[in-house]
């Protein structure tokens, strides 16, 4: 058995996905819109629904698609979104910001963390593009983040297990390393065994019925090539794999 119970965070972007993550046994939810773009700030209505969730829900604070380099207008929107999260009574936020060279933007992050005072904070995968992960981890610790969500800089966390293990060792008890990207029920236990992470993150999605991409709605761009949403069964399978460690 693992010395620590490994926590599962599930990222969702719909009301149905939120319900599926909770019913499947997730320990925490990262609440987003547009998971096809790796997650943007969720709509107010979805945050309001999440306020009654029986588990912690951390909304993503990401005002637009593209990079993580934010100007004053972006920062203003993000600070207002953090205030909205607090207003809905949600316990934390997922944030990140980069400089043009990929390094963490300490100036912007300080302002975001300050705005989020009293809330939990996760540093998102802006961490995965930094030039020096060891240095970036120390910055995250200094800023007071609870955890870092990272794939170890790889497309899949399973492809960077040595790096993730090194980050876990460096972090010690100061901050949690949460492995994400390419995490599925069939590989989550192996990922934990090889890295020592105490938290894992995934979308655990499956295909869902909906409008045919070849329909008029699809031709107009309203329907993606494949409709996916959080699968309660996949979440439950991942939870079962973790509990067996």
Curated annotation (Swiss-Prot):
Primary residence: cytoplasm
UniProt GO molecular function: copper ion binding
Pfam families for the chain: CutC
Cellular component terms per the entry's GO annotation: cytoplasm
Location of this chain's protein in the cell: Cytoplasm
Keywords of this entry: Cytoplasm
InterPro entries reported in the protein's UniProt record: CutC-like (IPR005627), CutC-like_dom_sf (IPR036822)
Source organism, top-level taxon: Bacteria
Similarity comment: family membership: Belongs to the CutC family.
PANTHER family: COPPER HOMEOSTASIS PROTEIN CUTC (PTHR12598), COPPER HOMEOSTASIS PROTEIN CUTC HOMOLOG (PTHR12598:SF0)
Protein name: PF03932 family protein CutC
């Amino acid at each position: 058995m693992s010395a620590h119970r490994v926590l599962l965070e599930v990222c969702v972007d719909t009301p149905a996905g939120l319900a599926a993550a909770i019913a499947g046994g997730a320990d925490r939810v990262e609440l987003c819109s547009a998971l096809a773009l790796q997650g943007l700030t969720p709509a107010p209505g979805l945050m309001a629904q999440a306020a009654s969730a029986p588990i912690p829900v951390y909304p993503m604070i990401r005002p637009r698609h593209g990079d993580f380099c934010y100007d004053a207008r972006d920062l203003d929107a993000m600070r207002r979104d953090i205030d909205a999260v607090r207003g809905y009574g949600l316990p934390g936020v997922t944030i990140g910001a980069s400089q043009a060279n990929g390094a963490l933007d300490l100036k912007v992050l300080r302002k975001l963390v300050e705005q989020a005072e009293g809330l939990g904070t996760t540093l998102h995968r802006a961490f995965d593009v930094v030039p020096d992960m060891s240095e970036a981890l120390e910055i995250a610790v200094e800023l007071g983040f609870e955890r870092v969500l990272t794939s170890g800089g790889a497309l899949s966390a399973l492809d960077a297990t040595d790096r993730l293990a090194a980050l876990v060792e460096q972090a010690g008890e100061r901050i949690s390393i949460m492995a994400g990207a390419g995490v599925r029920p069939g590989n989550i236990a192996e990922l934990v065994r090889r890295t020592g992470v105490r938290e894992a993150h995934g979308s655990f999605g499956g295909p869902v019925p909906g409008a045919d991409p070849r329909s008029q709605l699809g031709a107009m761009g309203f329907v993606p090539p494949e409709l996916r949403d959080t699968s309660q069964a996949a979440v439950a399978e991942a939870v079962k794999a973790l509990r067996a460690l």
